[in-house]
Amino acid sequence: MVHNFIEFETERLKLRRFKDEDLEYFYQYRANPKVAKYQGWQDYSYEQAISFIEKQKIAIANIPDTWVQVAIELKDHGRLIGDFGIHTLELPLNSIEIGFTLDPQFQKQGYATEALNGLVNHAFNVLYKEKIQAIAVEQNDSSIKLLKRIGFRQVKKIENSPFKGQIVNEFVFELTKVDWVG
């Protein structure tokens, strides 16, 4: 079965396609310098947020070498609290790379762990992926701890990588379906 988008629910969260109502919350956390610190953007504009949401409302998942973003909604309030980036890799086959962003006011409440567990389960058991990868800047302790808590293993260190005008080290993490189901 081909899945053209990634939608599922966890106990407290709904992961779904972006919609117009997400714009204000999305812009609010994306424009926050604390959020952007370890992300690929900085000085995020309102116009960028509008364009991004318009593109993501019609994005199609599972196309090799493309990224889609999945909105993370708090079910009780219908409010956007973050998003996942999901990159369908060309090689290795049946693999994805992920990235994640969570609004700071919803951090340290278990939402990132719940959302990532849900995404991993969905990727392996619904989308039939075999491997999930993530890359984190060495200083991004929160993301590294989250990945390890879920079961990701560090498989590589990329030294002297350019990032936002600096030279940093990055860690590549992987989780395979075999390791996930144990």
PLM regions and their residue ranges:
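A short helix-loop-beta-strand connector motif used in the catalytic cores of GNAT acetyltransferases and
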Residues: 57-71
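Conserved GNAT-fold acetyl-CoA-binding loop/helix
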Residues: 34-57
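Secondary-structure boundary/capping residues
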Residues: 44, 62-65, 132
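Hydrophobic residues in alpha-helical segments
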Residues: 30, 39, 60-62
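Acyl-donor (CoA/ACP) binding surface of acyl/acetyltransferases
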Residues: 1-36, 72-182
